[in-house]
Swiss-Prot record:
Tissue: Restricted to a narrow region of the hair fiber cuticle, lying approximately 20 cell layers above the apex of the dermal papilla of the hair root; not detected in any other tissues.
Name of the protein: Keratin-associated protein 10-7
Residue ranges of Sequence repeats: 41-45, 46-50, 67-71, 89-93, 99-103, 109-113, 114-118, 119-123, 135-139, 145-149, 155-159, 160-164, 172-176, 186-190, 208-212, 218-222, 228-232, 233-237, 238-242, 250-254, 255-259, 265-269, 270-274, 275-279, 287-291, 297-301, 302-306, 321-325, 339-343, 359-363
Organism for this UniProt entry: Homo sapiens
One MF term in the entry's GO annotations: identical protein binding
Oligomer status and interactors: Interacts with hair keratins.
Length: 370
């Protein structure tokens, strides 16, 4: 053989896709180079140990290659492998080769976790997990890899598709994008009591199985329930929480910007600026919508931009800049604007108040003494 120098991961075909491994033969060197090694000392490049890259380790089309018959030997990354295991990365699947290209090979394990674990199904890249297994998490599988895959009973879909709420779960239904699990058994246990859904009840219908992209459309069919178990990221339009005055975290700011208010709904605390408290009563249809939310008696410039320090990120009124219009100061329209004190920052509604009754005379012709 010619004396050339190449790394063990070379894809050079001059040796028939075979490179030399150290220690396989007395004539092989320890320098990870091909140095006049006899062909019997060489192995297929995809079976080379670390630091070989999986670009040459696990070609998608190597179904019958020797590298696909030895990738499942017992190793740290595949502790449960058996000799009869067939690596899914060697089959045509939604896990493309690109998801393996940058992963270094583990010792005696060429297939990185992103493409295959012990329990990963090859075609749709949806793992069937047992216990607290975390296989296929942080994988390159997009949500599309799950839309056409039927849910298996007791299946554990990876985070990219739909988390399952178990006793140890802490992020159930967050950033969920599952679409096809509506009637599957794997969706029936989503609302078990857990830290993330402490108020769940047995009759709860998991909304994360219905296009849970955290938009109002995903929740319109969910009925409101007292202490409802719908995750914060995807509250139904009709199930906006009723918040107490001392509550400051009952909902995220995004829950109000795009929701259409129902009659009698309660505006969450996070959506109440000090200078603007929309009252949802009667036939009101504008609460919780994006608006400047200025009280009728304040000018547009009465409030500073939202404070990043404020717990509720709400605007704060400047006492000196709230200039009221005459109709805001008293029950009668004859009140003069100059009769009113500047608005108080402490007032929840930030309303100007009249300083002295004498200023607001019964008629508009009365001279003001302010």
């Amino acid at each position: 053989m010619a004396a050339s120098t190449m790394s063990v991961c070379s894809s050079d075909l001059s040796y028939g896709s075979r490179v030399c491994l150290p220690g396989s033969c007395d004539s092989c060197s320890d320098s990870w180079q091909v140095d006049d090694c006899p062909e019997s000392c060489c192995e297929p490049p995809c079976c080379a140990p670390a630091p070989c890259l999986s670009l040459v380790c696990t070609p998608v089309s190597y179904v019958s290659s020797p590298c696909c018959r030895v990738t499942c030997e017992p190793s740290p990354c595949q502790s449960g492998c058996t000799s009869s295991c067939t690596p899914s990365c060697c089959q045509q699947s939604s896990c493309q080769l690109a998801c393996c290209a940058s992963s270094p090979c583990q010792q005696a394990c060429c297939v990185p976790v992103c493409c295959k674990t012990v329990c990963c199904k090859p075609v749709y890249c949806v793992p069937v997990c047992s216990g607290d297994s975390s296989c296929c998490q942080q994988s390159s599988c997009q949500s599309a890899c799950c839309t056409s895959s039927p849910c298996q009973q007791a299946c554990c879909v990876p985070i990219c598709c739909k988390p399952v709420c178990s006793g140890i779960s802490s992020s159930c239904c967050q950033q969920s994008s599952c679409v096809s699990c509506v009637s599957s058994p794997c969706c029936q246990a989503v609302c078990e009591p857990s830290p993330c859904q402490s108020g769940c009840i047995s009759s709860c219908t998991p909304s994360c199985c219905q296009q849970s992209s955290c938009k109002p459309a995903c929740c319109t069919s969910s009925p409101c329930q007292q202490a409802c178990c719908v995750p914060v990221c995807c509250k139904p339009v009709c199930c906006v929480p009723t918040c107490s005055d001392d509550s400051g975290s009952c909902c995220q700011p995004a829950c109000c910007t795009s929701s259409q208010s129902q009659q009698g709904c309660c505006v969450p605390v996070c959506c109440k600026p000090v200078c603007c408290v929309p009252v949802c009563s009667g036939a009101s249809t504008s609460c919780c919508q994006q608006s400047s939310c200025q009280p009728a008696c304040c000018t547009t410039s009465c409030c500073r931009p939202s404070s990043s320090v404020s717990l509720l990120c709400r605007p704060v009124c400047r006492p000196a800049c709230c200039v009221p219009v005459p109709s805001c100061c008293a029950p009668t329209s004859s009140c003069q604007a100059s009769c009113c004190r500047p608005a108080s920052c402490v007032s929840l509604l930030c309303r100007p108040a009249c300083s002295r009754p004498a200023c607001c005379g019964p008629t508009s012709t009365q001279k003001s003494s302010c």
